[in-house]
């Protein structure tokens, strides 16, 4: 029977309670992580296994050529990992101006010249080396099995796959890898990715070295050269992920932690710092005043982020200056409760997407995200090993007169990144690992869901399920069709220019949440998984 895969009725999800939990946007990935825990592995082992599986089961969102970030609570402290890769050695402004013209504002959105060094696999290895209990090769076994035997394509993945196909079918390796019948798979159709199984085996056997100096690196260099690119095995061999200290912002008695720039996580911190100057709880949770204040705070945050955030060594201001309480209080004063505004960047200088999370009964928690950037990334797939390559290079600027000169492309430099894991603590102790994927929706989702939990005491699943808005540019925002009509009317009356979106799968991100209930070995955790994706939280 051919079923109709449109869903006219609202579905309710409830939180999951368990002592060991994996929450992801695909059930097979969550189950792979749980298998690692049942074998004696910890939360980090589970996250790596889930991350590997999801490169196979959600190829629109990530692949073996992705970037990644993580925040880990190791039982004593938080540790951050930046596994985003840099530009190839040949990527100068002149390189792009000669190939694409001096008036091109960015490197290409698709194709081989949008590919920076992929960092996700190196991130898996770094996490395994520092925290893992199981052999690295064991963690990739579920992904290898799925790549070889195949899986049935779920609803949301299929929608995104089909939507991306017209733009990408002509990119090198794309049709061969992702259009086996000359089209995107249908919902419930079996898809195999046997070349990626070969790549996964090589990565497992070499503990990642095949991709960073071995047979896969050589294949990527040959493929890149054949299609006019410049990434080399030497670029790949030079790469190492970076351990970083998360940056933080206090809010309502808790502390939110994000990975520091070159990522946009600081936007969520800025917005919360601005909102701390308002009594949100005095306004209705879904009312126009609360939503208006959140939208305006997010606009102010993005104004500064798009102006200043880049590779840290090239930034004109520091994260500390951008988060200075006095500066954020001054930005809060710009908000007019009765009028939407288009804000410009301030001057903070003074004297001075997939997401998954796992937690285990021994207290280890990990907030992890990896992404190809736009759907299927560059669209380019190295065919021998099934390496689907990201397009993070498009995040650079090639415009000498652009808004953010600190983000100009340069050899060995990392571009502005959108993917951000988050972690919440209270008095130095872990409370919640969470994230909301979806380009610039990520910090907006971090802020909106956290406000619902901390200001309005909504549980993580309710906060996750609630209608969202998404700021775009200027006065324009997208709002989910489920938002209260009175609130929508009230926002319009204040000058917000709104597009009502019926298809929530495309525009509003998707989150996964694990909230620590007490002693992990006794009370355990509460988990939530976003209904806007195919995923689930699983545990025991």
Feature-to-residue mapping (PLM):
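Noncatalytic scaffold domains of N-terminal-nucleophile
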Residues: 1-31, 35, 43-213, 217-263, ...
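Active-site rim segments in enzyme catalytic domains, especially the processed small/beta chain
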Residues: 56-73, 77-82, 230-232, 364-432, ...
């Amino acid at each position: 029977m051919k079923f109709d895969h449109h869903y006219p009725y609202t579905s309710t999800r409830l939180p999951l309670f368990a002592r060991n939990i994996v929450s992801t946007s695909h059930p097979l990935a969550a189950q792979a992580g749980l298998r690692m825990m049942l074998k004696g592995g910890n939360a980090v082992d589970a996250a790596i296994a889930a991350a590997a599986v999801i490169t196979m089961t959600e190829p629109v969102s990530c692949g073996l050529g992705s970037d990644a970030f993580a925040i880990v609570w190791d039982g004593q402290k938080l540790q951050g990992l930046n596994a985003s890769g840099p530009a190839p050695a040949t990527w100068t402004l002149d390189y792009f101006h000669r190939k694409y013209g001096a008036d091109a504002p960015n490197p290409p959105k698709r194709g081989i010249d949008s590919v920076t060094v992929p960092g996700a696999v190196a991130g898996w290895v770094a996490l395994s080396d520092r925290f893992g209990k199981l052999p690295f090769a064991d963690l990739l076994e579920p992904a290898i099995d799925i790549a070889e035997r195949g899986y049935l394509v779920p609803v949301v993945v299929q929608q995104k796959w089909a939507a991306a196909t017209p733009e990408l079918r002509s990119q090198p390796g794309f049709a061969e890898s992702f259009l086996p019948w000359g089209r995107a798979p249908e919902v419930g159709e079996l898809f195999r990715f046997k070349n990626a199984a070969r790549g996964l085996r090589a990565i497992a056997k070499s503990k990642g070295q095949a991709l960073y100096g071995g047979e896969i690196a050589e294949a990527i260099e040959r493929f890149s050269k054949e299609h006019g690119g410049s990434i080399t095995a030497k670029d790949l061999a030079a790469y190492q992920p970076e351990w970083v200290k998360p940056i933080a912002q206090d809010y309502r008695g808790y502390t939110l932690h994000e990975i520091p720039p070159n990522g946009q996580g600081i936007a969520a911190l800025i917005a919360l710092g601005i909102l701390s100057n308002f009594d949100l709880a005095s306004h209705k949770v879904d009312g126009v005043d609360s939503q208006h204040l959140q939208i305006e705070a997010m606009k102010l945050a993005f104004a500064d982020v798009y102006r200043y955030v880049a590779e840290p060594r090239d930034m004109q201001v520091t994260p500390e200056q951008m988060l200075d309480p006095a500066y954020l209080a001054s930005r809060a004063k710009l908000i007019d409760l009765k009028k939407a505004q288009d804000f410009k960047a301030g001057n903070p200088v003074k004297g001075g997407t997939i997401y998954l999370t796992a937690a285990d009964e021994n207290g280890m928690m990990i907030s992890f995200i990896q992404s190809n950037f736009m759907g299927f990334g560059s669209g380019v797939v190295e065919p021998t090993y099934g390496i689907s390559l990201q397009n993070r290079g498009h995040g650079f600027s090639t415009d000498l007169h652009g808004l953010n000169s600190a983000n100009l492309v340069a050899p060995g430099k990392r571009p502005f990144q959108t993917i951000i894991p988050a972690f919440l603590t209270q008095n130095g102790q872990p409370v919640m690992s969470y994230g909301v994927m979806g380009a610039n929706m990520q910090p907006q989702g971090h802020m909106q869901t956290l406000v619902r939990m901390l200001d309005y005491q909504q549980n993580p699943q309710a906060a996750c399920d609630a209608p969202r808005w998404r700021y775009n540019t200027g006065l324009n925002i997208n709002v989910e069709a489920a938002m209260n009509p009175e609130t929508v009317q009230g926002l319009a009356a204040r000058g917000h220019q709104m597009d009502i979106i019926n298809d929530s799968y495309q525009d509003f991100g998707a989150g996964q949440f694990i909230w620590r209930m007490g002693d992990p070995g006794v009370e355990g955790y509460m988990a939530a998984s976003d209904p806007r994706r195919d995923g689930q939280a699983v545990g025991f």
